[in-house]
From Swiss-Prot:
Top-level taxonomy: Bacteria, Pseudomonadati, Pseudomonadota, Alphaproteobacteria, Rhodobacterales
Name of this chain's protein: Protein RdxB
Organism: Cereibacter sphaeroides (strain ATCC 17023 / DSM 158 / JCM 6121 / CCUG 31486 / LMG 2827 / NBRC 12203 / NCIMB 8253 / ATH 2.4.1.)
Domain 4Fe-4S ferredoxin-type, residue spans: 253-281
Its biological purpose: Involved in a membrane generated redox signal; required to maintain repression of photosynthesis gene expression in the presence of oxygen.
Ranges in the topological domain labelled Periplasmic: 51-81, 176-189, 360-477
Predominant location: membrane
Cofactor binding summary note: Binds 2 [4Fe-4S] clusters per subunit.
Coiled coil keyword on record: no
Length: 477
C-alpha cells in the first residue's frame, strides 16, 4: 500500500510544443537554399523526360516495377544488376559516416527529409499564425472564430503539402502524366491511392505535430552518431569559457567586468527547432542546424561583442581556446585519418560501380546444364548434353543472336525448334532457348567424364560477343 503522502512520478515527459522564432543569417540562408533544391528535385524529377528510343519509357527517373527495371536518365538497371543499387546504398552509408565524422549531424540539420519538410511546415505555420510569440498566444487562447480559421487554414495547407508529397512519390513508379490523369479520373490502381493516403497522413503527422519527436525517439541515427564522432569532429558548441558567468544586460548599463558575454537572452533557445539549450553542452537532440549561431551572432552585434559565442568548432578547439592556445584550422579537422579512410572507401565503391557500368555487356546470358540425365546416348552411339541458355536482350529493338560452341574436342551444336543456330529475341525481353551439344561416337569428349567447353552468343547486328564457360558430360570410361 502507498500512504497519502507518497509521491509518484511518471517516466513519460509530456511534450511541450516547440515554436521556433524566425531568424536570419548565413546558416538560415543555407538551409533555405538546401530546402528549395531538395524539394524542387523531389517534386519535379518525375516530370523530366528522356528519349530512350522506341519500346522504352521516356520518363527520366522511373522505377518500373511491372517490368522489373530502374531507369535513371541514360542508365538502365535490370533485376540481375541489383548490385548497383546495393553499391549506391553502401555509398550513401559511407557518405553519412564521412559527413558525421567531419562535421557532426550536418545531414540531420540540413538535408534530412524530416528536417526539410518540418522547415516547410513551420514556414507555413509562421505565415498563417505569425512568429513565435503570436503562435504561443494563439495556442493558449480559447477557441474562437480567429483561432479556428487560422488552424483550419494551416491544417489545409499542410494536407495539400502532404498530398503533393505522396503524389510525387507514386509518380516515380509509373509514367507521371498518365498516372496523374488516372488519379484525377478515379482510374488509378488502388495501390496508388493507398500509397498517397499513407504518405499524406505521415507527412502531415510528422511535419506538423511529431516534428522533433521523430528525431529524438523514432530515428536511430542520434544514437549511432556517437560512434562516428570524436573530439576532432566539428559541431555546434557554446564557448563556455567566454560566455560564463552569464547575466542579464539592463538597458543603458554596460556589462559587468566579471560577467561573461552571454546575456541570457534565450535567443539561441527560442530559434532552436528542437527546443534545446545549446549552452547545456552536447545533446542527443541537437541536429547541428546552426540556427542558434545566427541568433547569437545577431545579439553579439547588438551589444558590441565579437561573434562566435556559439559556433562550429571541435571539442579540442574549445579546450585550446580555454587554455589560451590557438585552435587548429577547420581543414585539419575535416581531413584527418578517419575521414580520409571514409573518403577512400566511398571513392573506391563509386569507382567500382562506374567501371562495372561501363564494362557491362548489352547481351546477358546464363547457361544451365540439365542434370537429369547428365547425357543421352543417341541411336548412332553419339552422346548428347542438353542446356538451357537464357538470353536477355537489353536493346530497344529485336536482335538476332547466333549461338556457337568452342572446345578442344570436336562438338556439334543445334537449337531446339530452330534449323539454324540463330535465335531472335524481342526488344527488352528475356528468352530461354534449349541447346543440344553432341559428341560423336568414340570421340574423346564422348568417352571422357568431363570436357570443358565455351558457349558463345554473338549479336549479329552489332558484332558483339559474350561467352559462358561450362562442361560437357561423357561416359567417363
Amino acid at each position: 500500500m502507498t500512504s497519502p503522502d507518497t509521491q509518484t512520478s511518471s517516466l513519460y515527459a509530456k511534450r511541450e510544443p516547440v515554436f521556433p522564432k524566425r531568424v536570419s543569417g548565413k546558416f538560415r540562408s543555407l538551409k533555405w537554399w538546401i530546402m528549395g533544391v531538395t524539394l524542387g528535385i523531389y517534386y519535379i524529377a518525375p516530370w523530366l523526360r528522356w528519349d530512350r528510343g522506341p519500346n522504352l519509357p521516356d520518363q527520366a527517373i522511373l522505377v518500373d516495377l511491372a517490368n522489373r527495371r530502374f531507369f535513371f536518365f541514360m542508365i538502365e538497371i535490370w533485376p540481375h544488376e541489383f548490385y548497383f543499387v546495393a553499391g549506391l546504398l553502401i555509398m550513401a552509408g559511407l557518405g553519412l559516416f564521412l559527413f558525421t565524422s567531419a562535421a557532426g549531424r550536418v545531414w540531420c540539420g540540413y538535408a534530412c527529409p524530416q528536417t526539410v519538410w518540418t522547415d516547410l511546415f513551420i514556414l507555413v505555420e509562421r505565415w498563417v499564425e505569425g512568429d513565435r510569440n503570436a503562435r504561443i498566444r494563439l495556442l493558449r487562447q480559447r477557441w474562437d472564430l480567429e483561432k479556428t480559421r487560422k488552424y483550419l487554414t494551416k491544417w489545409t495547407l499542410w494536407l495539400l503539402i502532404g498530398l503533393a508529397t505522396g503524389g510525387a512519390w507514386v509518380f516515380y513508379f509509373t509514367d507521371a502524366p498518365t498516372l496523374l490523369v488516372d488519379l484525377l479520373t478515379g482510374n488509378a490502381h488502388p495501390v496508388a491511392y493507398i500509397t498517397m493516403a499513407t504518405l499524406t497522413a505521415t507527412t502531415f503527422a510528422f511535419g506538423g505535430f511529431a516534428r522533433e519527436q521523430i528525431c529524438i525517439y523514432a530515428c536511430p541515427w542520434p544514437r549511432i552518431q556517437a560512434a562516428m564522432m570524436d573530439e576532432e569532429t566539428i559541431t555546434v558548441a557554446y564557448r563556455e569559457w567566454r560566455g560564463e558567468p552569464r547575466g542579464k544586460l539592463k538597458k543603458g548599463e554596460p556589462l559587468s567586468p566579471d560577467q561573461g558575454d552571454c546575456i541570457d537572452c534565450m535567443a539561441c533557445v527560442n530559434v532552436c527547432p528542437m527546443g534545446i539549450d545549446i549552452r547545456d553542452g552536447q545533446q542527443l537532440a541537437c541536429i547541428t542546424c546552426a540556427l542558434c549561431i545566427d541568433a547569437c551572432d545577431e545579439v553579439m552585434d547588438k551589444i558590441g561583442k565579437p561573434r562566435g559565442l556559439i559556433g562550429y568548432l571541435a571539442l579540442t578547439d574549445e579546450r585550446a581556446e580555454r587554455e589560451g592556445r590557438s585552435p587548429r584550422s577547420a581543414w585539419r579537422h575535416v581531413f584527418r585519418l578517419r575521414t580520409l579512410i571514409y573518403t577512400a572507401l566511398w571513392s573506391g565503391v563509386g569507382l567500382a560501380l562506374i567501371v562495372a557500368l561501363f564494362l557491362r555487356s548489352p547481351i546477358d546470358i546464363n547457361v544451365t546444364p540439365l542434370r537429369n540425365p547428365l547425357y543421352v546416348t543417341l541411336s548412332d552411339g553419339s552422346i548428347r548434353n542438353t542446356y538451357d541458355v537464357r538470353l536477355r536482350n537489353k536493346q530497344g529493338e529485336a536482335r538476332d543472336y547466333q549461338i556457337s560452341v568452342t572446345s578442344e574436342a570436336d562438338l556439334a551444336l543445334s537449337l531446339e525448334g530452330h534449323p539454324a543456330t540463330v535465335v531472335t529475341v524481342p526488344a527488352n525481353e528475356t528468352m530461354t532457348q534449349r541447346v543440344y551439344i553432341i559428341a560423336g561416337k568414340g570421340t574423346p569428349a564422348a568417352e571422357a567424364e568431363r570436357t570443358d567447353l565455351r558457349l558463345w552468343v554473338e549479336d549479329l547486328a552489332a558484332g558483339q560477343r559474350v561467352h559462358h564457360d561450362t562442361i560437357f558430360n561423357g561416359r567417363g570410361n
